[in-house]
């Protein structure tokens, strides 16, 4: 997942 991409960073939050």
Curated annotation (Swiss-Prot):
List where in the cell it is found.
Secreted
Q: In which tissues is it expressed?
A: Expressed by the venom gland.
The answer to whether the entry has keyword Secreted is yes
The UniProt keywords, alphabetically, are: Secreted
Cellular-component GO terms for this entry: extracellular region
Q: What is its main location?
A: secreted
What is this protein for, i.e. what is its function?
May act to induce hypotension.
| Name this protein carries in UniProt | Cryptide Pep-27
